[in-house]
Amino acid sequence: MTENKLDTSRATEAIKDARFVEALSLLESNLTKDPKHIDSLYLAAVSSRYLKNYDEAKKYIESLLSQAPDMGRAYQELGHLNRDTGNQENSIAHYRQACELNPALLSSWKALYDYFRTNNNKPAADHAFMQMNTLQSIPSVLLYISQILNEGKLGIAEEKCREFLKKNPTNTFAMSLLAQIA
């Protein structure tokens, strides 16, 4: 698994602004330098899916999963890809796997909730709804910290959590995250 210092910040901003062609160009440049760069593979899969280049998105995800087989966000992206290509059953299986690996993935919980509610599985829908509400109640930066913490990125998670606590010293969720990291 490669997590070197290739910069993905410009590509991330481009994705947030729905500039997927630009993002993909930046990410492909990164992947030329390091074809196993985890964040670049993930973001390239996201960009490709938004551009409806589903075969390319799948290739990026497959490469990503060969490097990081326990990355919940990769399974979430695989869920999105299957959803967008009309394969609902596979998408649900991938969303479930994503949530098992990383319980802080709000999009996966939302997809599971919608599926279970539509299929009249009340206990499962209630559980997904509870998870969704919990995740929606915390600030987005803490949700991000939870996600990367679940991926084992302890250093980044600790740094971001300490930054947040400097501005919000009484936030108990942030305190509990920092305790988990320690």
Identify what each model region corresponds to.
Residues P35, P69, P103, Q136-S137, ...:
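Short coil turns that delineate tetratricopeptide repeat
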Residues K16, Y50, D84-T85, T118-N119, ...:
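Register position in tetratricopeptide repeats
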Residues S40, A74, S108, S140-V141, ...:
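TPR alpha-solenoid repeat register
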